[in-house]
Amino acid sequence: MFQLYGFSAADAVQYAQAIFLHETSLAFVSKSRTELRDPQANYNKMTLKQFCENYPNIPLEALANGEGIKSEYMQELIVGQPAFFAAYDKLSAAENASVLKALMLWSVIRSSSAYLTDEIREANFDFFGKTMSGRQEDYPLWKRATNQVENQMGEALGRIYCKKFFPESSKKMMETLVKNLQISLGERIDAQTWMSDVTKAAAHKKLDKFYVKIGYPNKWTDYSLLNIDPSKSYYENVLACRKFANDKEIAEKAGKPVDRDEWYMTPQTVNAYYNPTTNEICFPAGILQYPFFDPKADEAFNYGAIGVVIGHEMTHGFDDQGRQYDATGNLQDWWTADDAKGFNQRADMYADFFSNIKVLPDLNGNGRFTLGENLADHGGLMVAFNALKNVTAKKPLKNKDGFTPAQRFFLAYAGVWGQNITEKEIRQRVKNDPHALGKWRVDGALPHIDAWYEAFGVKPGDKMFIPKNERLELW
């Protein structure tokens, strides 16, 4: 890559070696992705003065001021990895100017390689796409262009998307679904015999205070200050977009209270999230389409597809990470010691189960890393199926296409997790993705759901059968 940017072969080798040694040194003192899932261990408060005293070779204040962030806005900091900063501080003091120059050059190269010549872009894809992920070819030009518009002006595109694909009737249906799932999760909380009344009461308080976002934000981003100039290069316009986003972030957040109406995904994103620090659940319009949601389908389909997604995000508020935050999003313990012990014992069983799954002949899953997502998948299934029973109790659904309502619920769930994935990508995801692979979000979750056995008549000797006393349950 350095040579493609005009550097000599000798300089390219020298820079590459320096960068590799530097980043390897930092990798050895970085927490693993599993360790980063512990909110308490990664919540280390210190003042700006303490930070500067602890790490004198990291000019944090000067860097922040250079970005337009005043020192008065950063007098209190949360340092996720003190050991990393300690090592980086020592490394910065020891590095010579040529290494620091190489690092800065590489930062520019990596951040610009997708926006310059085809030769540079293809070299970037050869490594990150082919070598790291096993992809055979890059996205076509139309998709790369569309993705770029989405990345830089996501809400402008989202506003058009919602007008065309997300009617008000769909939003109202989702509001009803969310309400029914909240009722169901409350019932599941009450049903846990291992949990004390005092902790259940706190759980209900948190559940009742969920801030729900559906479809699109209440206020749209104003892009009037963003100037896209056709006379300038593609990369120059990308930089203009980045500067606009950076300036906007600082202007709206530095020294300001948290904006609970801010969205962390664009409306057209096919995803959903739970944010523990604001106790909010968000379902963008992009995921409120088939095969997750169909306004013309019956409850069996919608509760099995988007219903489980809703239950999944709600359960995140009570998984191994989310349970450590209270109803207002503060990192605060609201569990009795016995209840916390009971939770951890059950959660450990999930971690062990998914760690024993062979995703490839020579590779097991990482149940500890994927614990929160696996708990949310199982909880989402339990909560959504219970909600389906509630809403159809007085008016049972009929069989359709030869399948019972219960069967169609589970088929709808399984249908959203089909994947066409390379072996290289599997290996990457096991290391880097906190979700289990799509196959195991189905085959690893359903064998622990009693209703699934009843729906399909699964019996001893069948491939996915697990004895009842070995099935896991938390929510």
For the regions a language model picked out, list residue spans one by one.
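Zinc-dependent metallohydrolase catalytic domains
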Residues: 175-307, 316-475
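Noncatalytic, helix-rich "gating/capping" subdomain that lines the substrate-entry/channel surface
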Residues: 1-180
